[in-house]
Design a protein with these regions (language model features):
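Ferredoxin-type iron-sulfur electron-transfer modules and their immediate structural context
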Residues: 1-113
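Beta1-alpha1 glycine-rich phosphate/pyrophosphate-binding loop at the start
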Residues: 29-41, 48-51, 55, 77, ...
Length: 162
């Protein structure tokens, strides 16, 4: 009689990120299956909040993202890829406050003050993270508007202003 041995491996976060193609392809590792399932249930606000955990600007990226997740989507082998980027946009568009909302509760203030130079996506993201960690943050920007290349490099027909 042949003895067969099996090895059980519990899938952790790193396994999921490596083996779910859309998750592995996303530069910020957004929980794509998680927010799509919430949209399917009609829970747009939960989908938006889940998306915002990995990405401070889901309403913007739902419009301009290069969506490498769609190129990696396994569904394309059956018919066509899931419209992941459009679903991200839908979650933001259906959010009652229009896509603005707290990602995590603010922590009690710390006395240390920090400055962030540049109000582009990276500067605003780090300022958001630091403020939510309780630091007092001031953002400096040379341009007359915040947003960096989002505001001055992307045409208004692609990303609406105001």
């Amino acid at each position: 009689m042949t003895q067969v041995k099996y090895r059980l491996q519990v899938a952790g976060d790193s396994w999921w990120k490596q083996n779910i193609n859309c998750l592995a392809a996303c530069p910020v590792h957004t929980d794509v299956p998680g927010y799509i399932s919430r949209i399917a249930e009609g829970k747009f606000e939960e989908a938006f909040d889940l998306n915002r955990k990995a990405n401070v600007f889901p309403a913007i990226l739902g419009r301009i993202c290069m969506h490498p997740c769609e190129k990696a989507c396994r569904r394309r082998y059956l018919d066509e890829a899931v419209a992941i980027c459009a679903l991200k946009r839908a979650a933001a568009d259906h959010k009652p406050d229009g896509g603005d909302g707290a990602r995590v509760p603010l922590v009690a203030g710390k006395t240390r003050r920090l400055a962030v130079v540049g109000a582009g996506p990276a500067g605003l993201t780090v300022a958001d993270d630091l403020a939510r960690a309780g630091f007092r943050v001031t953002v400096f920007e040379a341009l007359p508007v915040a947003g960096g290349m989002l505001n001055v490099g992307i045409p208004p027909y692609r990303l609406a202003r105001g």
